[in-house]
Amino acid sequence: MSKLCYMKTIITLGMFCLVLGTLVAQPTMTWESPIDVSSEEFGNRCTRIALNQAGNPMVLHGKTGDNAGLYLSIMENGIFGDPIQIVSETNIYLFGESEGPRMAVYENRVAVSYQIFNEWATGGHVVISEDNGHTWGEPYAVAPTATEDHFMPHVAFNDDGLPWVALKLGVDPTEEGILHFNTDLDAFDPAISGSTATPGVCECCPSNAFGYEGMYYNVVRTNGDNLRDFWLTASPDGVNWDSAIDIDETDWVINACPASGTSSTVMEDGTLISAYMSASNGSRVYWSSVDLSTFTFLETGQIDPSNTFSENHPSISSSGAWLVAAWERNSDDYNVMVAASNAGPQALEMSVVNVTEGLSGNNRHPSVVYDGEHIHLAYQNAENGVVHYLKGEISGASQVEGVEIEENPWTISSNESGWILKGEDASYTLYDLGGRTLETGKFLNELHISNNNKALILQVRKNDQVNTFKLVK
């Protein structure tokens, strides 16, 4: 199924609707065989992948117990070198995959943020490499004299290549803390509040800090009376965080912390795409889109609306018009799913594939980066206690030429009771905005959709042609 063309219709006295059909094409991903990033001796906890300035994949992975530590494995000429232990500290918090260390890249600089276990106030650290991850300096404590919690640092770089950190500040209430690096002091400045415009902060959900065109951004799971939606916060200077918008229409209410965050990427047209898990209708993975130029929320949808299995831990990346998403799915065993689209996030569902099918054991916690030529995927292989790396390529496209309006086989109109679709016989699926399937079936000549005061997605399919209508009261 596909939601390639979303058309918003607004009822006043009537409804106005513009429709463009699309012919559906499915991109193909081809994969090399998985390889071990390192041996079991170096662990597979909290896996993250990024590319350094040379374009080489770097995989961050941690180990608890014997040989505990935080390691970076770098691929050069198709081979991963020996893991580099980036800090001497061994008591690193690696027990929550979503809450674990983070990695950021700026030119030849690579930064990793991490938390020392049981040192919730002073244990947040950032360590930096100046040579694409090969050697590492002394770590910086982000709040060495703090007396209140500074938990789960998420490091990012600003446009000048200086690190800054978003984290969870304090307990009951918890705020989003922002800390900037001060070059004069060679240390991080004290935390400032980055959540003044949000309805509370989810106390153990990781931050998602990043920069784009001089702006500072952070995607935060909020907590407003146990409504735990994701919000995008923004600041022009990293100090004044008075802009925030709700980017999550799933409206998940839960009275415990779900300990999950987002993965985000900015497309070539300035659209921010974020991927996240919500469990308002079972644990599923979703996408959300925002126009950063106008700071306007656009849409939310389920990555694979037809799926009925539990999903979690999405990762997303883009280059040019292409968007690549990876996540885990639990259908008896855990497997890693991947989807790609050059027609927006709505078309991801057309290419969903299980890339670990046939491998023994559970394969979980994927991290993906796409460089415009290759998909670089790292994930946790539980059976062997290692990180696997997969390299893939995309061929084909998610969308071919549009259908001219006069060739459109369906028209839609409205009245006080709902919507009326007329045209060629076809199958249809009705979704809510969270991607939940409400109704499926076939119709002959005419279909009536009742107005229940909720926004709906109507998808109509005949052979390879798909039209999708967004129906808004």
Over which residues does each language-model region extend?
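Bacterial Sec-dependent N-terminal signal peptides
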Residues: 1-30, 397
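Extracellular, repeat-based ectodomains that mediate carbohydrate processing or recognition
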Residues: 26-396
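Short strand-coil-strand connectors
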Residues: 77, 424, 461-465
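Glycine-centered tight-turn motifs at strand-turn-strand junctions
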Residues: 415-416, 437-453
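Short proline/glycine-enriched turn/loop motifs at strand-loop junctions of beta-rich domains
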Residues: 421-428
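Short, glycine-anchored, charge-dense loop/turn motifs used at functional sites
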Residues: 430-438, 456
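C-terminal tail/sorting-segment detector
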Residues: 454-473
